[in-house]
């Protein structure tokens, strides 16, 4: 489907936004602010260790995919594009294990992201921590 915002020259730009299902700030302002502070603190720590901003956004997109949060996927995809991430890697992210587009460091970060995000009822394997630390 082609619209004014989705053309051959600009295939990924859209004026549509993902609807917000719940206004967290209005209904749980303290919780929302705590999450925002946690995100800011995590970003500061990642900046201290020179963690690539593009990889940071890929990690956030992948966690959002696993959590099924359309709003977060949309937000972090826009942030990844703004940081210079390639469309190819963004599109391939859900199948990152099957593509050659990701480095060993990327793969370690994505594997750890999946383990931590999906750890309900299990634990994060030691091998994932070890691989992430090695890269």
Residue ranges and their predicted role:
Residues 22-24, 52-69, 97-98:
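Alpha-helical scaffold segments that form or flank carboxylate-/histidine-based iron centers
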Residues 33-37, 68-72, 120-126:
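Short acidic alpha-helix initiation/capping motifs at coil-to-helix transition points
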Residues 43-44, 60, 77, 94, ...:
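Amphipathic alpha-helical segments within well-ordered protein domains
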Residues 1-57:
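Acidic, glycine/proline-rich low-complexity segments that act as flexible tails and inter-domain linkers
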Residues 25-26, 30, 92-119:
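Short Fe-S-cluster ligation motifs
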Residues 60-91:
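Conserved alpha-helical segments that form or flank metal/cofactor-binding pockets of metalloenzymes
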Residues 52, 86, 134-135:
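Helix N-cap / loop-to-helix initiation motif
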Residues 109-135:
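Short flanking/linker segments adjacent to small metal-binding domains or redox-active Cys/His motifs
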């Amino acid at each position: 489907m082609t619209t004014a915002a989705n053309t051959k020259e600009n295939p990924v730009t859209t004026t549509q936004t993902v609807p917000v299902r719940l206004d967290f700030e209005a209904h749980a302002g303290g919780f929302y602010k705590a999450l925002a502070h946690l995100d800011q603190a995590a970003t500061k720590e990642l900046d201290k260790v020179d963690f690539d901003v593009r990889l940071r956004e890929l990690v956030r997109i992948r966690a959002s995919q696993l959590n099924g949060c359309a709003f977060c996927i949309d937000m972090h995809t826009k942030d990844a594009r703004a940081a210079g991430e390639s469309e190819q890697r963004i599109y391939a992210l859900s199948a990152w294990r099957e593509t050659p587009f990701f480095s060993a460091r990327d793969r370690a970060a994505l594997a750890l992201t999946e383990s931590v995000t999906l750890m309900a009822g299990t634990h994060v394997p030691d091998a994932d921590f070890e691989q992430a630390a090695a890269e």
